[in-house]
Amino acid sequence: MIDIAALSLDYWDDLMVRMAHHSTAIEGNTLSQGDTKSLLLDGYIPRAMDLREMHEVLNYKRFMDFLQQSLTKGRALSLDFIKEVHAVLCKDAIEGVAGRFKEIPNLVVGADFVPTPPYLVSTDLQNWLLDLAAQLAAAKSAEDKIAAICRQHIRFERIHPFSDGNGRVGRALIVYSCLQEKEDPIVIPVEERKRYMNYLNTEDLQGFVAFAKELQKEEEERLRLFCAKG
């Protein structure tokens, strides 16, 4: 269990850079982690780059402010909260309207399922929120909490509530839920994209939870080092 109030500024910066780089890279963004650091922490554009890719990364600066403020206020997940996350992360980075649920049906390339139709998105997400809250309330261990968060992430990506940006929103909700529960955040590295996508595509909850626990172990070590540094 972690103390959110005790996390160092350096750790928050590190988390922001890694979330921005890995989550956007999983979706195909070509900027390096060094490029991401330059944009977010150093405040300069290190080279010529695609404008959309730059906005995808820069949006994480606003998102980290949003995340910290929401944690401080104790904000619970809600439909409006999810739309706000999308609005922040997808500003100037998608063709659709950031912060608005999809209005036409969409498909996931290569998937063997059909996402929730637009007219059912709000209902399905409301049930998703209720189920997540119930599972977390019933959790008797940290592993139970992580299983609930992973289970609901798989389900969120199958609802696919937005026209674009579903993956980065879903992964941001993983981090927020972990921090809400005082658990080490889970940052999925782009190097493990195939493994991660396989867990989603096959709905392999057991494998996904084991993977998440591996990532938490790595995060725990990063937290320890940043605390020692501070």
Question: Where are the language model's segments positioned?
Answer:
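FIC/Doc superfamily catalytic core
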Residues: 1-230
